[in-house]
Amino acid sequence: MTQLPKTPLLDQVTYPADLRKLEDRDLPQLAREVRDEMIDAVSRTGGHLGAGLGVVELTIAIHSVFDTPDDRLIFDVGHQCYPHKILTGRRDRIRTLRQEDGLSGFTRRAESEYDPFGAAHSSTSISAGLGMAIAADLDKNDRRVIAVIGDGAMSAGMAYEALNNAGALDARLIVILNDNDMSIAPPTGAMSAYLARLASGRTYMGFRDFGKKLTAYLGKNIDRAITRAVEHARGYVTGGTMFEEMGFYHIGPIDGHSFDHLLPVLRNVRDNARGPVLIHVVTQKGKGYPPAEAAADKYHGVNKFDVITGAQARVKPNAPSYTSVFAEALVQEATLDDKIVGITAAMPNGTGLDKLAEAFPSRCFDVGIAEQHAVTFAAGLAAEGYKPFAALYSTFLQRAYDQVVHDVAIQGLPVRFPIDRAGFVGADGPTHAGSFDTAFLTTLPGFVVMAAADEAELKHMVRTAVAYDAGPISFRYPRGEGVGVDMPVRGEILRIGKGRIVKEGTKVALLSFGTRLADCLLAAEDLDAAGLSTTVADARFAKPLDHDLIRQFARHHEMVITVEEGSVGGFGSQVMQYLSSEGLLDNGLKIRSLVMPDIWMEQAKPEAMNAHAGLDRAGIVSTVFRALGRGVAVGVAG
């Protein structure tokens, strides 16, 4: 294990109040030490590295200038919050990031008063900040509210809805646009910094306020003339922007790694701003760590790594990942069917659609962080006879539910939804768990809902989705590697609404939806050994259900247990509804539904999370024994 970095200045800073005692000339050294601390911590835990390294100076400057936590500081998404955590009383736990019982990898209200708003999904900061700014006005409190949002998050419509509303309300809100991709405009050196300072200073802001007061005094007839004069002055100084059209006073771009640029602007805004202000700051992802600077995409999210070389720890997989199996199967099918297109919302690598883009660049679309648009865009393609695969993580599909209902399901359009990261996802915790997709999709008429039990089943479901044109269809699969089954050369087309029995028994029936099948088979071994002959089936479909299979289980077994890595209201609830409506519960059938517990489960390794939820081998056996009034045999479910 490498030695901890030497951080004499950072050792003096536990909270932002300590930071404010430092001289401006000390801050560059503090930034170097915060970077060293963060690099060392993430090298031991893994996590999001590049984004945090890019905002070290910005984070220090904000905490130096503003009176946090009384002034509210909100980070969008939260990938960049590690320096913030180091400076807000959590440095002693920074090497527990994303570990069980450790610090969250995102901002979290329950963790610190310095996290006024939790985040993990994108583009929420301006809306939340606006709510807090209006609350401060209603309370007649002069606290400032600062929302830090990345240029990537600005691709989502919600950010613009909030900007539009903030401008209309003339809210006292500070938005800092962290442009770490140089995608909007780079700073142009000393002149840019000077103009930004000038634009944020008392003179120009005073003119703007004077214009408002004069308009109020003389009436609206003079408003257009004053507006033209103010806009001319603003455009002359900084260049007119769409943010200004929305009512924001726009400053920048400025160098986000220069305290000489950041501190004067932030102080001017703190002391003079009365309406909404947007500060455009340009930063470099991975700043200060050469491997991350050279390959920002590879160091966005990292495993544990060697600080000296940057080499990340790699565990040799026992089987291909579900994501790679999906990608390979989709490319295979797209080679045979030129109507197949892929859609991703800023996650081409995470969803595997980068492979489709490499093979068929004109048939793969990255729409940015815009899940709502992605789904309706897919609906438009489907309406014209294409076969769109809108590949989204389960947690992000939630963001587009109205589009799934209104634009896809009601119209019966055959949009295909590959749902990645289904179930527990481990270190990213409850904000990224794939908990609810089965529950919210099975409520929709005409929607086919599948889950892959293993990587071979996933390949079958890709081909099934290609062949299915009668309406929308989804298939879910987890993060991580498969179980190591033999793989078909090409997937088979499954019969819609038909499951499969993988082990015959007579007393207990385990009906699995998804990848809990492997644990069901292990549990069946223990139950057989305890004298409880057990049937195991892979449901494949939560909608439509395999009614014949369920009736067979109900009539020929003493007990039925459904098992799924999803929330209450999903597959098990669909089975229960069917059994109830058919009168199959009237003769004493014992039935239990194993689902994710009705809590927000904290980060841990997925296997530990499944064990805690009772969804593993031991939990299934224990549920059977309790339902049958038997004690848990020592060594069977232990």
UniProtKB/Swiss-Prot annotation:
List the keywords (alphabetical): Isoprene biosynthesis, Magnesium, Metal-binding, Thiamine biosynthesis, Thiamine pyrophosphate, Transferase
Q: Does the keyword Magnesium apply?
A: yes
Q: What does the UniProt cofactor note say?
A: Binds 1 Mg(2+) ion per subunit. Binds 1 thiamine pyrophosphate per subunit.
Q: Which InterPro entries match?
A: Dxylulose-5-P_synthase (IPR005477), THDP-binding (IPR029061), Transketo_C/PFOR_II (IPR009014), Transketolase-like_Pyr-bd (IPR005475), Transketolase_C (IPR033248), Transketolase_CS (IPR049557)
Q: Which domain of life is it from?
A: Bacteria
Pathway named in the protein's UniProt entry: Metabolic intermediate biosynthesis; 1-deoxy-D-xylulose 5-phosphate biosynthesis; 1-deoxy-D-xylulose 5-phosphate from D-glyceraldehyde 3-phosphate and pyruvate: step 1/1
One Pfam match, by short name? DXP_synthase_N
Enzyme class comes to transferase
Listed Gene3D superfamilies: 3.40.50.920, 3.40.50.970
Q: Does the keyword Transport apply?
A: no
For activity, the cofactor(s) needed are:
Mg(2+); thiamine diphosphate
GO annotation (BP), single = glyceraldehyde-3-phosphate metabolic process
- Extract the GO molecular function terms from the UniProt entry: 1-deoxy-D-xylulose-5-phosphate synthase activity; magnesium ion binding; thiamine pyrophosphate binding
Tell me which EC number(s) this protein carries.
Answer: 2.2.1.7
Binding-site list for Mg(2+): 151, 180
Quaternary structure and partners? Homodimer.
Q: Which family does it belong to?
A: Belongs to the transketolase family. DXPS subfamily.
What the protein does? Catalyzes the acyloin condensation reaction between C atoms 2 and 3 of pyruvate and glyceraldehyde 3-phosphate to yield 1-deoxy-D-xylulose-5-phosphate (DXP).
**Annotated protein name in UniProt:** 1-deoxy-D-xylulose-5-phosphate synthase
The encoding gene: dxs
